[in-house]
């Protein structure tokens, strides 16, 4: 006669012994031995797709197997995000994600997402950062952050801003700025992103926006938009005379939008480390840096997968506080 639960405890003990052995055996196998799928959460042509298509051939060259880009657009990136989170943790399904998909969506889509990126994905490395710029319509009188705040306080209820939609980081960044500055701003979302935001800004229908530099640089240079500040820690070479948000008294306001490579959370560490090393080698090549610089992207590889994973978790927590404090919710 066995005491109650003995068989169950024995079974659990066997599983506890076998799982590490299975993981060790899997990680000891050569990797990769077949093509690797690289999920992109947006349609072709955007920044996330561009970096994925630049890095994939270099990973193929380094690791000897094809890295195939697979665009899974839709649901603000959540379709690809959830596909990656639910994939087998064997290194054969990766995700190129960004600050929106991997640090913000977990809070803004909390009631509808079936996965939690901070729990269900592991970071391999940050790839690039994309500078953003705080822009204004040419017809808007202020030229600095301080002047913008002064104008807003003298004209309550008259200052509005564009974003790519509720819960996007241009929206959340402006909420953070308004709170820090003690001003009120009216949000006008454009689901078409920069394609709709730019005409609205240039016509003066809206006065302000945080938007990526690549989308606005030509309009700024042509005098159709006004650059008030940039969001990187230091001034960007393309706009050397435009001070940063930090220089104007608002450090940490405005996102340095990053793109990064992720894998399912239980992917063996040797595979994650091997991918990280390949990414570092690929993005250290001068031709890659030059190619990405032409797209106004700055190479920004992480020191280690652990560092990147921790960065994303820290940012996820910070964005969750912004979302909670401003009662931003998407059902």
Regions from the PLM with identified roles:
Residues 1-33, 146, 330-331:
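Short, low-complexity disordered leader/linker segments with a strong preference
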Residues 83-92, 99, 107-196, 245, ...:
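Hinge/capping helix and adjacent helix->loop/strand transition within the periplasmic-binding protein
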Residues 25-120, 158-160, 182-208, 219, ...:
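N-terminal (or domain-start) structured segment
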Residues 100-111, 171, 176-180, 208-242:
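A ligand-binding cleft/hinge motif common to bilobed small-molecule-binding domains
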Residues 47, 51, 55, 59, ...:
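Stable alpha-helical elements in mature extracytoplasmic
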Residues 196-198, 237-241, 311:
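Short, charged, surface-exposed secondary-structure boundary motifs
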């Amino acid at each position: 006669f066995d005491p109650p639960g003995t068989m169950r405890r024995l079974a659990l003990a066997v599983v506890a012994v076998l799982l590490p052995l299975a993981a060790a055996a899997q990680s000891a196998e050569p990797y990769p031995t077949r093509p690797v799928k690289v999920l992109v959460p947006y349609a072709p042509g955007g920044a996330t797709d561009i970096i994925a298509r630049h890095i994939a051939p270099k990973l193929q060259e380094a690791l000897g197997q094809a890295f195939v880009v697979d665009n899974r657009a839709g649901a603000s990136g959540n379709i690809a995000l959830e596909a990656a989170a639910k994939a087998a943790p064997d290194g054969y399904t990766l995700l190129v994600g960004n600050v929106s998909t991997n640090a913000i969506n977990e809070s803004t889509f909390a009631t509808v997402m079936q996965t939690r990126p901070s729990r269900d994905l592991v970071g391999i490395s940050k790839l690039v950062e994309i500078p953003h710029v705080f822009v204004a319509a040419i017809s808007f009188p202020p030229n600095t952050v301080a002047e913008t705040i002064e104008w807003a306080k003298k004209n309550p209820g008259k200052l509005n801003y564009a974003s790519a939609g509720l819960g996007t980081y241009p929206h959340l960044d402006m909420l953070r700025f308004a709170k820090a500055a003690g001003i009120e701003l009216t949000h006008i979302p454009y689901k078409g992103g920069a394609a709709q935001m730019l005409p609205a800004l240039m016509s003066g229908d809206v006065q302000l926006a945080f938007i990526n530099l690549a989308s606005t640089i030509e309009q700024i240079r042509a005098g159709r938009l006004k650059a008030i500040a940039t969001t990187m820690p230091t001034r960007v070479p393309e706009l050397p005379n435009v001070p940063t948000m930090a220089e104007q008294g608002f450090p940490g306001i405005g996102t340095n939008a990053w793109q990064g490579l992720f894998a399912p959370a239980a992917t063996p560490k040797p595979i994650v480390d091997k991918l990280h090393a390949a990414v570092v080698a690929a993005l250290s090549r001068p031709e890659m840096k030059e190619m990405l610089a032409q797209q106004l992207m700055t190479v920004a590889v992480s020191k280690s997968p652990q560092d990147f994973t921790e960065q994303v978790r820290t940012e996820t927590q910070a964005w969750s506080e912004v979302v909670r404090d401003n009662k931003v919710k998407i059902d």
